[in-house]
Amino acid sequence: MRLRLHQIPLVAMLAMVACLFTACMSIPERASGSFVERSIEVAGTSHRYQVFVPASAAGGRTPPVIVFLHGSGERGNDGAKQTQVGIGPYIRAHLNDFPAIVVFPQAPDETEWSGNADLVFASLEAATREFHGDPDRTYLTGLSMGGYGTWEMALRAPGRFAALVPVCGGLAHPRRPSMGVSGIAGAADPYAVVAARLKGTPIWQFHGAKDDVVSPDYSRQMDAALKAAGARDARLTVFPEANHNSWDPAYSQTPELWTWLFAQRRATR
């Protein structure tokens, strides 16, 4: 017996359509986390970047998203070096239980993050869309040059990120002016300007007390400015024995960082 379309109850038809739609939109199950390479074109140039995609059991259907900005030594166009220092080694040690999508853009040689904002945001949006990330649980972190880049990107898109984790970063650098955060050079108190713009975003800074590359005073001044501005959640951890490498103790030896970070959600707009 052939069933005519008009004989199917409306509710049943809607249920069938919903099932088909859900099947089309389903996310493949991932037994383990993995790094995948992607490329994106920005201003006519193709850039390779990496994305860590978590195991389905760890990340769920809509995982949080982290953008990681590397330091000077990982610049290039190989599309991989940026996963070898900082957050990448920690993730490799926790492939099956790290719960977040992590986006690893790579700045070209001899450039700063301030000149690569389009690359950062384009790779973030592409990865979030492809892997079904949660835009309200999107976090930004970076080390050294990437710590400067963390402030740069946050200022360019206030409210875009649910939390910031700058590691051994700052706003300006006397020996490398090009690395400084753009748009605040003429301010009488750049720390106060940044704090006023970002006080609504939870921020946890990390630095080494013995850092002779980027002074820990930069993070101390930023922390003081945030608290003076009435910041929603401003934290600073200074590791007493760490030099410039404060990223290993931050990412790999501070488990409470991850508990804190993944609890943050972008404020309802």
What do these predicted ranges mean?
Residues 11-22:
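Bacterial N-terminal signal peptides
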Residues 57, 71-75, 108-112, 144-148, ...:
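Solvent-exposed loop/turn segments at secondary-structure junctions
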Residues 21-65, 141-143, 183-186, 220-224, ...:
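A domain-start/cap signature at the N-terminus of enzymes
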Residues 149-153:
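Hydrolases whose catalytic domains are alpha/beta-hydrolase-1, hotdog thioesterase
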Residues 65, 69-123:
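Active-site machinery of serine-nucleophile hydrolases
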Residues 163, 168-255:
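The feature captures the conserved acid-bearing segment of alpha/beta-hydrolase catalytic domains
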